[in-house]
Amino acid sequence: MIPRDPRSPAPDLSAINQPAGRAERRSGPATLSASIQSINCCREARVSSSPVNSLRNVVAIAAGIVVSRSSFGMASFSSGSQRSRRVT
């Protein structure tokens, strides 16, 4: 950090002394973000599971059954638990 010369005036960072009529940054059109938002909503609707599957998973978890998901989003059920094979 470069030391400031004590004889120079202190910088004034107040908003009052900023040039009037200039925005800090320019924003893009509002329709761009709305179109991206609608695409994301459509993707989420396809990815989410149906209420029946979600309820089935909650009941299985409450009963102590292990529920795991594969890379394709399919749920597989197994009773009991398995010991971790990771060595610490």
Swiss-Prot record:
Superkingdom per UniProt: Bacteria
Region of interest called Disordered, as start-end residue ranges on this chain: 1-31
Alphabetic keyword roster: Plasmid
Protein name (database record): Uncharacterized 9.2 kDa protein
